[in-house]
């Protein structure tokens, strides 16, 4: 990913756009055809470009000055009718399209690892949590199936963002093609694999760029959510999973026992930066009239950084999921913690099915559950003592309501929906 945004790679893109524009003009008879091979001998010298920029204070003019020096009279065929943003915005579109391709490969790799782990953990029972509290049983595989579904949407989201940003422009100072034949624009964009912006000003409208970084921020948010779950699962009181931890890795300078979920914490922290970069792109939409330059300084930071950070996050999350250690015994113990209160809804529904008013049934089950929690008793034993329950449910019927596997009876449908069956 970093290679896409290296200064030399950027300058090479600028040069290719300038050369293609000259070729386009040559096809129209406006530039001598025999000049094109000579122009193609142009090279980029980042050090020379930097030196010139320090003098002229304009990166594109410094670039043109540097590449023109060995070209002699042929240099006049470069930048014909163009404005700086014709080159800069079109090059940025190529860079972001390539960056999206890297991110899509990353997403495909993470998707495959999550798919494999979801398949393996389909029947691994654990407790589901809402508001941070025990709710009802589910399986780790079911949770991972949700991640898989979300990653599918992430891939589609990046694909849409890629398509929207895959747009170039060579339309001149305010976008009217007064100095650039539209056929030159079409030729250059086609050779670069870009669509032509239907309408542009001096720049490509920044709603496209805002949407691109917003898409990256949403993907980062998904990884943030996954990593947050892992962090809680690894907490000492829960201890259901563990991140990969190297043989020589250390968790604390003071406490040798520490095995912290630092990889997941890192992902959560980096997600905040990507969200911040997206906000910058949203702020950059409101340029003055046909263009000002307030967006430029910010974009030079946020686009390379956001792409590289998300690339790293995706590869790191792939490493975490692939190497995640699952403690199934601890999951089972946690599931039964609280004396079986996670089965309260099944008792409620059974009482209603046997003729009890729903609100009455709710209150009976609620009192029994809270008593079990407060007194450290087994919910199953407390609810069995309630006279209203004994009147309607036999001990055998009540016993069947405390089977964790019951909650997985329709997981197959979910797996089929996400393509796991």
How would you name each of these model-derived features?
Residues 84, 176, 191, 196-203, ...:
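A structural signal for small-residue-enriched, beta-sheet-centric alpha/beta enzyme cores
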Residues 185-278:
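Acidic, glycine-rich loop-and-beta core segments that form the ion-binding/anion-interacting portion
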Residues 1-13, 17, 37, 41, ...:
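Glycine-rich cofactor/substrate-binding loops
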Residues 26, 30, 115, 119, ...:
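Hydrophobic/aromatic-lined pockets within catalytic cores
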Residues 31, 36, 238-239, 357:
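Conserved hydrophobic residue
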Residues 1-171, 177, 181-187, 196, ...:
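A helix-coil-helix interface module used to build multimeric assemblies
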Residues 142, 210-218, 346-354:
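Short, well-ordered beta-strand elements within core beta-sheets of diverse protein domains
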Residues 97-108, 115, 145-148, 152, ...:
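Short amphipathic alpha-helical segments with heptad-repeat character
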